[in-house]
Amino acid sequence: HLSVDNFTVKHDNQHIIVNGKASPSPEDSIVADLKDVDVAYILNLVNFHSVDFAGKATGKAIVKSLFNQPDAYAKLDINDFLFENGPLGVLHAFVNYNKVDEQIDIKAVADEDKGNQTIIDGYVSPKRNYIDLGITAVGTNMKFMESFCGSFMDNIEARASGKVNVVGDLSHINLVGDIEATGKMHMTQLNTEYHFEKLKAHAIPDDILLRNDTI
């Protein structure tokens, strides 16, 4: 077995503190206590760049049965959470390794001000090179859409409600689903800023259809 006693990495108010014992037994565990740890730094360590997440993570990550059939999970609060460079407030996430399907399951809620909220439920499978994150938007900041629509729009300042999925091969991720949005955006090819109210958007692989819009 492997024993870890208060292994600490610290910088200013940030820290990672690791304690516990790793063995084939499910009764033994390694616990990492995190405070204000840069999420982007963690993703760089594991070489995951298919989807951009950022923010400062605080919480605990636990690994059991490290030398047998590993079981890993984490409960984290992430301040200043960014999804594809779009701010979504504070993310409260439960992440666990699904041994049966060999994927990372994610259940999370991102809270912004004024009751705006984003609910995330899905998985990432490095083994199958696949992602499927269901997103329920309730007044969600749509800045993250620029990463999917950057070829024809930018400067998105809008909020939306509806359901979409970030889905597909990790080398070619798509957005599918339906939302209703109010705000403004800049159409790059026309060099024109559009304002819209209750714009209905239907996302399909590699395309977004706009319906019943008032501009």
Regions found by a protein language model. Give the residues of each.
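Interface amphipathic segments
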Residues: 1-215
